């Protein structure tokens, strides 16, 4: 976003060299403007009245200020719609179409880690040490593992109507085919919590780490051989379930 904004501003200033800017709030039909940006002045012709260097500098400064204000206003208008689609973005972030196995987690997970890094960078060294989960002795209640899997590993899945559908391994595109990859998170069968959740009082509770699922969109084929994009369930987390012990 920052690079795009700087590019637009530089291009905008290069156009200013062709003719001086007249400070006015009147827009003519022949005024130049970039898409999504409203101009606050009109460009006079080359043969028009001249403007001093000080006036031109002031005009350019005012223009930059107006552009920044408008971009911030547009950003505030877009954010509410982004918040409404947050759930859908999280669902679809675990699916990727690629010609090879992805080497990193989904972008949403990387952005979350980057945000945590920025938050930690703004802390003092002392606060940062105390906020480190490892230093505070924090451990996950259940051990989990995350990995990319293909349709060849899944083969079938359950859609939102409860029916079993076949997950297609490859998706046709204009230049060939791409494989569907799913980023799944499940309980680690080799972890230390395979016999119960960590930190639970076993005298009063029976605990178990269980893998839970969420819906993601994938290319599938139903029992009637109809191919289409459907929401299917995949493993997305490992949670702790508790049951109270009876007879005590």
Swiss-Prot record:
Chain positions carrying an annotated carbohydrate: 122
A Pfam family that the UniProt record links to this protein: NGF
Membrane spanning residue stretches: none
Superkingdom of origin: Eukaryota
Propeptide position ranges: 19-129
Annotated positions for site Cleavage: 57-58
Gene Ontology terms describing biological process: cell surface receptor protein tyrosine kinase signaling pathway; modulation of chemical synaptic transmission; negative regulation of neuron apoptotic process; nerve development; nerve growth factor signaling pathway; neuron projection morphogenesis
Sample GO molecular function, one term: growth factor activity
Compartments, as annotated in UniProt: Secreted
Post-translational modification: Mature BDNF is produced by proteolytic removal of the propeptide, catalyzed by a FURIN family member. In addition, the precursor form is proteolytically cleaved within the propeptide, but this is not an obligatory intermediate for the production of mature BDNF. Can be converted into mature BDNF by plasmin (PLG).
Signal peptide: 1-18
GO cellular component: axon; dendrite; extracellular space; synaptic vesicle
Annotated function: Important signaling molecule that activates signaling cascades downstream of NTRK2. During development, promotes the survival and differentiation of selected neuronal populations of the peripheral and central nervous systems. Participates in axonal growth, pathfinding and in the modulation of dendritic growth and morphology. Major regulator of synaptic transmission and plasticity at adult synapses in many regions of the CNS.
UniProt family annotation: Belongs to the NGF-beta family.
Protein name, per record: Neurotrophic factor BDNF precursor form
UniProt organism field: Lipotes vexillifer
This protein's encoding gene: BDNF
